[in-house]
Amino acid sequence: MWNDMKLAIAFLSRVPVPLKQNKGNLKKICAYFTFVGYLAGVFYFSMKLISENFLWTLLSVALGFYLFDLFHFDGLLDTLDGFFYQGTKERRFEIMSKGDIGPFAFFYAALYIVAYLYAFLHVDPIDLIYVAVLGRFSMNILLHFGKPAKNTGLGKLLHPYEKKHTLISLVFTIPLVYFPLNYIISLSIALLLGSSMHFITNRKIEGYTGDVLGATCMFSQLSIMVALSLI
């Protein structure tokens, strides 16, 4: 179990983790999405406790993205470009695999960052743990109900997805019940967006990819943060 947890940290973040060769099962890292979320959440929580100055917030978000969210954000950009293209599924795959930033990705990514920074400035520090943990749980929901859209890539590597991983990942969120309203709001959004992305991706590309998983995480994190900033 510990090797799988370390593999999850190494796979989903830039936090240096010592890994023994051939230790850990890639398909089992899904059970620890929310565990990795605690690492990201505690980082953002700690940075916001130090200062809520705007320049410090920019630095906090930049470092947090570098350590924990850049991988997911890249998936968001590719997904935006691919899904807004009005064409065939094959052409969408081609656009998403290029890695270039197209007009849709540039425009909506700019809006995303502005909204993210605004919400970050207006949430309580503790809320950032809910954002990071439950935001990642939305990926479990997408994996639970979906199937990979391609026979290659990260989506395929995580398939077949063991349904019990959703429960394990949910169990890691139990400490967050300490603030029940925050938990209910965050969990509800994660469930809603994970399920919604399942239906959207089925219509667009007939399944999920690694990019779509990242986009789901980023959409969920922003939505949870905005919701918690309003209470």
Curated annotation (Swiss-Prot):
Pathways per UniProt: Cofactor biosynthesis; adenosylcobalamin biosynthesis; adenosylcobalamin from cob(II)yrinate a,c-diamide: step 7/7
Keywords for the protein's UniProt record, in alphabetical order: Cell inner membrane, Cell membrane, Cobalamin biosynthesis, Magnesium, Membrane, Transferase, Transmembrane, Transmembrane helix
Cofactor(s) essential for the protein: Mg(2+)
Transmembrane feature ranges: 29-49, 53-73, 101-121, 126-146, 167-187, 211-231
One Pfam family hit: CobS
GO biological process: cobalamin biosynthetic process
Catalytic activity: alpha-ribazole + adenosylcob(III)inamide-GDP = adenosylcob(III)alamin + GMP + H(+); alpha-ribazole 5'-phosphate + adenosylcob(III)inamide-GDP = adenosylcob(III)alamin 5'-phosphate + GMP + H(+)
Cellular component per GO, a single term: plasma membrane
InterPro entries xrefs: CobS (IPR003805)
Record localization: Cell inner membrane
Main location: membrane
Superkingdom of the source species: Bacteria
EC code: 2.7.8.26
Topological type in the membrane: Multi-pass membrane protein
PANTHER family on file: ADENOSYLCOBINAMIDE-GDP RIBAZOLETRANSFERASE
Function: Joins adenosylcobinamide-GDP and alpha-ribazole to generate adenosylcobalamin (Ado-cobalamin). Also synthesizes adenosylcobalamin 5'-phosphate from adenosylcobinamide-GDP and alpha-ribazole 5'-phosphate.
Protein family according to the UniProt entry: Belongs to the CobS family.
The protein's name: Adenosylcobinamide-GDP ribazoletransferase
Source organism per UniProt: Kosmotoga olearia (strain ATCC BAA-1733 / DSM 21960 / TBF 19.5.1)
Lineage, highest ranks first: Bacteria, Thermotogati, Thermotogota, Thermotogae, Kosmotogales
